[in-house]
Each structure stands twice: as structure tokens, then as C-alpha cells.
Amino acid sequence: MNTLTASPQNLTELQECLEIAKKQNLKIAIKAGGNSYSDVFLASNHLIIDISNIDSILSFDSENGFVIVESGVRIGNLLKMIMPKNWGLVGLSGSVTDLIGGMLSSNTHGKDTWKNGNFSKNILSFKLLLANGKIEEVSRQKNIELFNGVVGGLGFLGIVVEITLKLNPIKSFMVKRATKKIYNFGDMIEHFYTLEKSGSDFSYVLLDPFSSTKSLGKGICESSMYVNAPKCTDAQFEEFLYPKRKIGLLKPETFWSTIRPFWGNNTCSLVNKLRFFRSQNNFTKYSVEPFPKIQYGYSALPKFNLLYAPYGFFELQSIFPKENTIHAFTELLAVSNQFKSEPWICMVKRHKPDTSYLTFSGDGLSIAINFPLKSLNSNLREKYCNKLFEIILKFNGKIYLSKHANIPKSIFQKMYPDYKKMSDLKNRYDPDFVFSSDATNRLLVENS
């Protein structure tokens, strides 16, 4: 049997899908925004349930900052409603097409995670459709174990159908943004660990992976903060809350096929050098722009992944304790150079700890490396991944599960020792593995 897909329109239809799947002995994988690079919603001979049509905003208390949403609500639609009322959310990823249910299940993080933590900090409670067909109301107060298992749990335990969020007060939806040069890893560490004094809300560093050994760690830092400033027009605010259909006058397919022959390591190296040259030594120049433009700038470049066609790309994000960061980053970039797979994108963020069992978090810095697969055949790719895993374990790091589909179970268990708690919850709430994606089978099924 081939994989089937269902797109229920409401809770009743969702429950019917669950019952039909159980009667037909089909396992269920859950698809939200479809932005994960992992295999969390992929499955062979399964029923994939797409929750994107269960997308009502049920209530919004604009005075006190509470909102109740169904799990298929798109983040862009929610921000359009709450930000003009001076409310925001924390721990947002860079994809404007993320669904709230998927953000909960991945426990996303963002450029403000150093200050506010992961997306879980917004969550007061949620309703969970269990394998037995019952709906369980979950919160930190009612069931902390299930809360910590479902948040960041990649859909392993059930389907989140409704979420109550506590919003974050903001000065306005306007943000002041500035960049400065980072000359080495020492500069980078100093920047991230003096952020509390800066007044910033958001910050990240883009490293230049093509820099020489002497200037390894060179790059630019961007920091920004909410400000009381004259608001832009509604059209300017909403422009980046929706994925664009064209890049200029061109369809994305045409644009990227035109750019692709001229794009490679040399082009990326040049872009990094120009970006560094144009930046200031200090945060002396800034611009004031609407939050969506800063958060979702990539929405102006739809189907960005087509730049890597036809071979695709590989992304791995790993986090390390502060004291291990420089050595870990140095070795990761050295291995990339050894395999002639320098990342085209190399971003660093600071994080905070989180209590959820499978959440990508901790008191340290993460590095995301994104590189094309054109130069790596399957054999080289496996060797490269194994070397990366070795380095990450060596420096007590862990990998973001939503961005990598090749982590062996043995590596996963070392990086996420709370997997035992997840296994216990799985046996308690879904012993027949009704909810079972390729990721579930790879990471939680015994003898897989």
C-alpha cells in the first residue's frame, strides 16, 4: 500500500481519520507546515494527516494578552492579528509558513532565544488527541510529564488540536536593527555574553566559513530591539507575513535556475567578504523596520531551496556549552573544509535551557551549517556525517532533531538522555505506536 494523505477540516473529521486509520491498521504521521528538514512527518505505508486546514483563531484577549488557536493556524496570520495590538511571541523560527502546532511540536527557537527561551515559553496549555481517541488537556500544572513530552516531541505522542498562548508585550511592531563586524571567535563569545547589557531583543552572528585559519570566526553580527517608533503602513507591515509568489518579476523556478550556474563557493566567499566590508565596527548605524521584515526576510526569496537543485542541500544545527564552543566550531568548520563542503550559510545563536525532553536547548551557543550536496556522493556523505557526529559528541553537543534525518539511535540516545522518559510516555499513551513517523521508528522503536 502507498502512503495516504488526509486533510481534515475540523476536529470531528480529525477524530474520524484516527478511527479509520486504527480500523485499517494504518499508522499515522502528522504534518504541520512541512518545513522540517527531518523525517518527522514522513512515513511509508502510513496515513499522513495534514492539520493545516484546522486553522481557526478561537479567541484573542487583546487587553491581557491571551490567545487560543487551533494547531493549523499559520504564524503569519496570528502575528497579523496580535502585533498591531502590541503583543508578540517568543522563540519564533524564520519560516512565515510555520503552523502553531508544528512550532509547539518542534519547540522552535529564534534570534531572541538567548533572552526569552524557546517557543514553549508562550504555551499555557493545549489539548491533545491521544491514540485512544480521547482528548487530554495538558499544562505544566496538570500534567508536567506529558507537557514536557509533547512540547518538542515531534508528534510522537498524539495530535495537538488546540493551544492557549500567553503573549509577550512589545513596544510596537517596529524594530531597530544594526550590524557590526565580528573578527574572531573571541569577539563572538564576548558579543553573545554581554547581550544583557545591550538592550537588544534579538541577535545572531553570520560566520564567514571561507575565512582563513587566522581569521576563523570572522563574520557579522546583527542585533535588534523593539522600539516606540512611527509605524509603517499596513501594507509594509504585512508584506513579509506571506510567502511571495515571485522574486521581482520572475517566478521562483525561473529566478533560481538563472542564478544557479553562477552560484558556488567562490560566489559565497565573495558575498561574505562584501557583507563584512559594508558592516561597521560598532552598532553606529541602524534602520527602523517592521518586525516581519527582520524576522521573515527569506519570505522575499520563495523556494530558496531551488538554488541547490537538483542535488539538494544538507543542514545540521548543533549546540554546545559555552566553554566548548570555540573548539567545537573550529573542528566542525575544519571538517567541512576537509570534505570540500564549506557551508553556504553558517549562523550562530545563543540559547537558554528548557525542560522539554527532546527540545534543542541549553546554556550555550548553536551553529547551523547549510551546504550543497553536489560534491558529496552517498558514501562521502555518510563519512562526513559520522565525522560531524563524532565532533559533536566529543564536545558534549546535541543536534536539532527537526533539521536532520540521519541521526542513528545510538547517537540520539547519548545526546538526549531524556529519551527514556519519552519511551515511557509512548508506552503509556500510545503502546501500539499508532502515531509513528519514520523519525519515531528511527529513534524510539526498539531494535530498529
Show which residues each predicted segment covers:
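Noncatalytic alpha-helical scaffold of FAD-dependent oxidoreductases
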Residues: 1-448
